[in-house]
Amino acid sequence: MAICIPVNLPDRSYNILIEKGSLANLGGEMSQLSLGKKVLLVSNPEIFDYYGQIAVNSLEKAGFAVFTHLIPAGENYKTLDAIAQVYDSALAHRLERSSTMVALGGGVIGDMTGFAAATWLRGVNFVQVPTTLLAMVDASIGGKTGVNHPQGKNLIGAFYQPKLVLIDPDVLKTLPVREFRAGMAEVIKYGVIWDAELFQQLEDSDNLASFSQIDGELLQTIITKSCQAKADVVSKDEKEAGLRAILNYGHTIAHGIESLTGYTSVNHGEAVALGMVAAGAIAVKLGMWTAGENQRQTDLIEKAALETRMPPLNADEMVNALTADKKVKDGQVRFILPTAIGQVTISDRVTPTLVREVLSPTESGQ
């Protein structure tokens, strides 16, 4: 039975549908949304090989005319040049304002497809079909779209909500173990910032490190709870005027790590895990939460088989990278810091000196 989570917004409300096997009914779900008949399905070659034909068959069965555009996998393809190629496909297939771009893939595909949809003809319809755990619980929900700039991650983008987010947990069976663990970092994040009960469930679970070992019912629960947390926050603050900033917990340091490692050696979820470790250590130093709570967070991250020790990075370069973060206000880097399991706050008390201390090898992971 499908779980339906509404994202309630003033102008563009939509539903998150979670159901095993639901990819085969993508066309049926979209046919209820009064969309035009043309669909541009955007994916990467590997995901398309696994699931593209299921999506295409479902869409065509529902009467849609389907065209495809494939983008090579990887954060280094998240560029304006790649977006221009999506535009070329949209032009070649004569997409209209009533047409729909469907993102079938992970966070990179979702971000790029959403940005292309937001900007082509000043906005065409957009549907998210996430195929990674990270995209299911985070990137596909909330309307953040965009691409990277050489100087920073997601600096070019727009808020543009999808018409539908369709989540089929069955597609996770082909997700590489490393990517599954990356998604668990975002799940843990929701436990720290919003849902102490979810955090406790994760602590009590037997295995979090792979799809093949995690309990199927638990997986459905953590996807649902994570989506509900994201939907609750986005419904209250669509464009990050205040509350929504808490979703960036761990991301300030994470984006710096990704930038300094060239978006190659450390993936987004791994960087978020390291960012949460750093934020937790900063919060302890500022007296905002206890060493015991911080250790619980570190232990849970390690339970998901995620690294908690910083890679060798130049602390000064990291501090400089933080100044390009989107959360900078009046030149001051704002950190999301934990105050208890299930609660965080926005702080401007974090100095460059404190960041350097936490990033030093003797401090990281503590």
UniProtKB/Swiss-Prot annotation:
GO biological process, alphabetically ordered: amino acid biosynthetic process; aromatic amino acid family biosynthetic process; chorismate biosynthetic process
Compartment annotation: Cytoplasm
Keyword Lipid metabolism attached: no
Superkingdom field: Bacteria
Reaction equation(s) it catalyzes: 7-phospho-2-dehydro-3-deoxy-D-arabino-heptonate = 3-dehydroquinate + phosphate
Residue spans crossing the bilayer: none
CC per GO annotation: cytoplasm
Keywords from the named record: Amino-acid biosynthesis, Aromatic amino acid biosynthesis, Cobalt, Cytoplasm, Lyase, Metal-binding, NAD, Nucleotide-binding, Zinc
Major localisation: cytoplasm
Single GO MF descriptor: metal ion binding
Binding site for NAD(+): 107-111, 131-132, 144, 153
InterPro entries: Dehydroquinate_synthase, DHQ_synth_AroB, DHQ_synth_fam, DHQS/DOIS_N, DHQS_C
HAMAP family according to UniProt: DHQ_synthase
Protein name in UniProt: 3-dehydroquinate synthase
Name of the gene encoding the protein in the UniProt record: aroB
